[in-house]
UniProtKB/Swiss-Prot annotation:
GO MF, any single term: structural constituent of ribosome
Function in brief: One of the primary rRNA binding proteins, it binds directly to 16S rRNA where it nucleates assembly of the body of the 30S subunit. With S5 and S12 plays an important role in translational accuracy.
Designated name of the protein: Small ribosomal subunit protein uS4c
Organism, as annotated: Woodwardia radicans
Assembly, per entry: Part of the 30S ribosomal subunit. Contacts protein S5. The interaction surface between S4 and S5 is involved in control of translational fidelity.
Gene this protein is translated from: rps4
Amino acid sequence: MGRGKTPNLGEFRVATDQSASRKISQFCVRLEAKQRLRFNYGLTERQLLKYVRIARKTRGSTGQVPPQLLEMRLDNVIFRLGMASTIPAARQLVNHRHILVNNRIVDVPSYRCKPKDIITVRNRPTSCNALKGESPGGGETPDHLTASLSEGSRPTGLVNRIANRESVSLNINELLVVEYYSRKA
């Protein structure tokens, strides 16, 4: 009688952690590297594939080109300058036409910045209010960018040069991303 009512704990098998004992495949390693890169920059699969295809066409190391292209995107430059707290917030600033590049309104977050580009905030109250909580230079500004305050305490940024591998703060093996996409294209 007592045996039917109380479960015998010895009869249940102890579940082993199979994920720790199983070897991770090379596909999984490449997929994780690609997903880390994608989610860090807030890109869609198609956008990242486009950057990898551009990298294949260029001369030099194919693995170093996608991070350079991603670091030179306008939304990422605004984030690195400290004008926005996150990359999605930087995308919103650009989409809402608060950002000027070389004194021209740019509303495309994927705009590729070039050396000597000057990035400022529009001189209107709503643009200044959008940046109230942000402060330029709050974090470590990469060496390919320069952050400052212009007249009227508007945040300003300058792109000194194209980003190199040292200025990219991600711990991702870019070759794994390129290898992942070598099957697709």
